[in-house]
């Protein structure tokens, strides 16, 4: 009998999902991306060699694993082929193993132009997007004017839809942002020149997933970004433009909710955030700089430095609730090596409706509410020994084990996996999600 697992980030992204997905594909026959676009950045280290994927599922690095991009993903044709080319030059077979939903909305040059024009206009109030056109592409999807992947195979239909959205977006670019417009003919010619290279990978993904599941295949659904960036449940408006929670695995791939059996929530042993938005446990001191340096905290997509802070259990509890997390995987435990005293955020002081201060053990909804919160900490002793590469829980320093056990107690979810380094094999497994 097949078992299907959803892997999601429980923080603001960059939790180390790529490595864990790659590790789990040892027992999966298919890996599915179901939301986001090439704004995601999944870094994998295998045998000391680093690979960064933005759009293609992490399972592509495992021979004989089928990979799928579901309808919930927005696709840049050029970015897709750039990534395919990068993998093929590394000797990885992509074309026979990757299938992309014909219903995926496209990211076009007008979306990138609009994304960047908006960020410039916002000035100091910018959201901190990756500038890759993700948000505007999702807007077109919701407005029912998106160009979808299947439209590329019908020249006249593609031309008509492209003309419609360029009329709309060019008017905004020219008259509202005073920015250069996007040329229709150039966009059409450049996009159509890619069609024959993309065509072999396009398929009816919901049907393929249904058939694979019926045949007994284990499927792994790979989330991008993190639950606290979810368009509905995140720190709005400092969020991404898609649903990043486990439930999106169904709508973004076409598989039924009863076919999902386990949700693995990925969390760092501390907290990071890229771009703007409230971050109660953020550190601007030597500890924060230690975490950033040792954890190599720079965005895989943008290269921007990540903001670092203490572990925030109240934020994680919000993620656990909205995702129905079955178990946690704690990553980058080794980054905490050498920190003398650890602080674990267990909740917030916040103003109640009667303007009286109260304690909350769970993150409030919305950026404004979170920005007014003051974290409440518990202190625990750190450890001086190295945890790098440890694969057995009992071999961890006692202080590290106590730290993890306290995380479990506060968050009320079991820790099933622990990552002690960037390499695939530097992993402790307490309960295997597929078993």
Swiss-Prot record:
GTP binds at residues 13-19, 41-43, 306, 332-334, 419-421. Keywords: Cytoplasm, GTP-binding, Ligase, Magnesium, Metal-binding, Nucleotide-binding, Purine biosynthesis. IMP binds at residues 14-17, 39-42, 130, 144, 225, 240, 304. One of its GO terms (biological process) is IMP metabolic process. GO terms for cellular component: cytoplasm. Belongs to the adenylosuccinate synthetase family. The active site is at 14 (proton acceptor), 42 (proton donor). The gene is purA. It is found in: Cytoplasm. Mg(2+) binds at residues 14, 41. Its EC number is 6.3.4.4. Its cofactor is Mg(2+). This is Adenylosuccinate synthetase. InterPro entries: Adenylosuccin_syn_GTP-bd, Adenylosuccin_syn_Lys_AS, Adenylosuccinate_synth_dom1, Adenylosuccinate_synth_dom2, Adenylosuccinate_synth_dom3, Adenylosuccinate_synthetase, P-loop_NTPase. One of its GO terms (molecular function) is magnesium ion binding. The lineage of its organism: Bacteria, Pseudomonadati, Pseudomonadota, Betaproteobacteria, Nitrosomonadales. It comes from Nitrosospira multiformis (strain ATCC 25196 / NCIMB 11849 / C 71). It holds the Pfam family Adenylsucc_synt.
């Amino acid at each position: 009998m097949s078992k299907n697992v959803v892997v999601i980030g429980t923080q603001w992204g960059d939790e180390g999902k790529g490595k864990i997905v790659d590790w789990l594909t040892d027992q999966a026959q298919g890996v599915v991306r179901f939301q986001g676009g090439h704004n995601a950045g999944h870094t994998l280290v295998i045998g000391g060699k680093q690979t960064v994927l933005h759009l293609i599922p992490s399972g592509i690095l495992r021979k004989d694993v089928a990979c799928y991009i579901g309808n919930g993903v927005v696709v840049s044709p050029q970015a897709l082929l750039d990534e395919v080319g990068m993998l093929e030059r590394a000797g990885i077979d992509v074309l026979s193993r990757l299938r992309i939903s014909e219903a995926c909305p496209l990211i076009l040059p007008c979306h990138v132009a609009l994304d960047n024009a908006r960020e410039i206009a916002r000035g100091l109030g910018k959201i901190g997007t990756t500038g890759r056109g993700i948000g505007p592409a999702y807007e077109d999807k919701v407005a029912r004017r998106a160009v979808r992947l299947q439209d590329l195979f019908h020249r006249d239909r593609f031309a008509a839809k492209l003309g419609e959205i360029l009329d709309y977006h060019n008017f905004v670019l020219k008259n509202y942002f005073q920015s250069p417009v996007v040329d229709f003919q150039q966009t059409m010619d450049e996009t159509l020149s890619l069609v024959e290279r993309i065509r072999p990978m396009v398929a009816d993904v919901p049907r393929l997933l249904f058939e694979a599941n019926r045949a007994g295949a284990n499927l792994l659904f790979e989330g991008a970004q993190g639950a606290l960036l979810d368009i509905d449940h995140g720190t709005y408006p400092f969020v991404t433009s898609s649903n990043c929670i486990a439930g999106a695995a169904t709508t973004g791939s076409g598989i039924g909710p009863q076919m999902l059996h386990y949700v693995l929530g990925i969390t760092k042993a501390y907290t990071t955030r890229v771009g703007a938005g409230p971050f109660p446990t953020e550190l601007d001191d030597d500890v924060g700089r230690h975490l950033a340096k040792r954890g190599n905290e720079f965005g895989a997509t943008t290269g921007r430095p990540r903001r670092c802070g203490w572990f925030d259990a109240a934020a994680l509890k919000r993620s656990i609730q909205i995702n129905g997390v079955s178990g946690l995987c704690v990553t980058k435990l080794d980054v905490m090596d050498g920190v003398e005293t650890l602080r674990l955020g267990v909740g917030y002081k916040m103003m109640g409706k009667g303007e009286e201060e109260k304690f909350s053990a769970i993150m409030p909804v919305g950026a404004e509410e979170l920005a007014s919160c003051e974290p409440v900490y518990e202190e625990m002793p750190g450890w001086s020994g190295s945890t790098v590469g440890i694969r057995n829980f009992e071999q961890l320093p006692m202080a590290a084990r106590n730290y993890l056990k306290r995380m479990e107690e506060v968050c009320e979810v079991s820790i099933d996996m622990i990552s002690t380094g960037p390499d695939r094999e530097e992993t402790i497994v307490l309960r295997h999600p597929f078993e």
